[in-house]
Amino acid sequence: MNYPVIPRTFFSGDCFDAYRILGAHPCTDPNGAEGWRFAVWAPGATAVEVCGGFDGWERGVPMEKADTGVWSAFIPGLAEGDLYKYRVHGADGSAVMRSDPYAFATELRPGTASKLTKLDFTFDDTAWMERRDKCRNRPLNIYELHAGSWKHKPGATRPDGSDGWYNYEELARELIPWLLEHHFTHVELLPLAEHPFDGSWGYQTTGYFSVTSRYGTPAQFAGFVNACHRMGIGVIMDFVPVHFAANADALAKFDGTYLYEYDSDVGQSEWGTCNFNYYRREVCSFLSSAAGLWMDVYHCDGIRMDAISRALYWQGDPNRGVNQGAVNFLRSLNHGLNERWPTGIYMAEDSTNFLKVTAPTRYEGVGFDYKWDMGWMHDTLDYFATPFGERPGCYGKLLFSMHYFYNELYLLALSHDEVVHGKKTIIDKLWGSYAEKCAQLRTLYFYMYTHPGKKLNFMGNELAHFREWDEKRELDWNLLEYPFHDAFQKYFAALSRTYASEPALYDGEYNPDCFEWVANESCAEGVYAWLRKGRGQNLLCVMNTQDHAHKKFPLYLKFPCSAELVLDTEAGTWGGVHKAHRKQSFHTTDGGVFGRDYTLTLDLPAMGSYLLRLAPEAPNPDAARLSANKALAQKRKAAKAAKAAAEVSDK
């Protein structure tokens, strides 16, 4: 028999396209017979057969083993769509019917058979592919989506009788206008690799090369990506390179040995899944090729890698030490992805303090482009959940992120993980009455979109969704019938548009010179103010997090300027307290403190925020003198107050 030629890179752990050889592929044998060639890596197996509907799932066609540990067979007369499995006789004496690890499609759950599939979709997205990049100095505003619960298809039902799903192409037609209306640049899909359990949301994978059949075929998914690209929207795939589902018909003890997983106590994760063995080079090639499939075959624009903390450290526990094999694999994976698809975006969900996660591999970094800022997320949500009267005591929570921000290339994420399992949704986490939650939600998102870092929001955040996410139900679209929720989604769209149209909010955001605190000592007042700078532009961001307004609040600047209001979270359009005819521009006055010689005075609404565009004006030569005099007067006033307090104490 002519064995398939397995590239040496597969055995060295450096292969990114093993799916071109392993799995099932249409071919013609030396005698001219058309059929399908099957190849599976199972070095510990004593025998393997291909079974399917073609023989009634009985005896099967025996496969032959090469010295490489790869079993292969050619079967004529099969057709695309036929189902098959491998009966693997394991080293432990077992004989188990297993799905093909490299199959391109699998039947709908609860079925687990692999499906003969050709990948021959033709894209027409050349213009997009040529201009896409990593968005270093461009907006990156990601919509995180679970394809099965964003919206259900009216009148359709699933095989189990529940509300129907849109297929991939139908989903594109519904979704793309919403993404464009809300100025998202990319959609990030929760894992679409095949998985048996809906409740895992795709994070307990069995078919790493199979696009889940829940929502259609591989060709329909390619059509989804193509449609997004034609409308200028990137597609990012959520990928699970750390652990896999322990189902007996999939990868677990595939050939009767611990082939893909560790054989010790670190072989099982906290979720009951199996941890990949990164010290097995063929496993590294398996994972690299699975990532490569999304980038190459399906034209995805990036990959978000899940649970990276569980790879960097054994069982995700720094006390157990660094898993150097995993670190080496991730470096190799990111290096290979960037070498082959240099304009792709590669992101890590990592909650650890592991160093240089986003540093290039040539500088001994792990090589990711961005890392989720879990600290920013926790501090922000904790602060806004705090009662107003207690906020002065935790004022520093909203300052802390900028102390470490430049250590990595961070992305700010309010993801699906924050709106499930009793954590409450974003709006429901906030302190206060319904009206106070509404006002604070606008300000929280103002803080997110004016803070340095790329952005990601889970579907429903833009609706101010009150119900926690449930993968079995679609979003509560009827919320848009209520004035606040309709106004909020319009505010969210306006905020996203502002983010996309103001270069100072994204250009140079990883450069410390492009950010400056203006007010970060206003603990009692709950006011924060900062400058964003880029392309010669200065934007002043001002945020009041208390439940009372501040009249004539002074902000001290280093230069004289006029200030034009760009965005007001309390505008009546969004359900705020301000009327349309209110003042839109302001000017600094001479005199300040702290070496800042000019003062901008604003009336700050309760729980409200302003974004202002600053235009420099000619300086007053006496401004420094006035500022010094004002500082001296304040110093004398403080000394006088201290003396009076001391005299009272003596009495």
Language model features: what each stretch is:
Residues M1-L140, Y168-L179, H183, E436-C438, ...:
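Carbohydrate-interacting/catalytic domains
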Residues A42-G44, F54, D67, G77, ...:
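Short, flexible loop/turn elements at secondary-structure junctions
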Residues A95-V96, K151-K153, H195-D198, H243-N247, ...:
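Short catalytic/ligand-binding loop motif for oxyanion handling, primarily in non-cytosolic enzymes
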Residues E107, A127-N137, H146-V322:
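Substrate-binding/active-site clefts of carbohydrate-active enzymes
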Residues R109-P110, H299-D301, Q315-K472, A500-L555, ...:
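Conserved alpha/beta catalytic core and glycan-binding cleft of carbohydrate-active enzymes
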Residues F123-W128, E170-R173, C284-A290, F388-F400, ...:
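A Trp-anchored, charged/polar loop motif used as the substrate-binding/catalytic surface
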Residues T212-G216, Y278, R320-V322, L430-E436, ...:
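Short, contiguous acidic/charged loop-to-helix segments that flank catalytic cores in large enzymes
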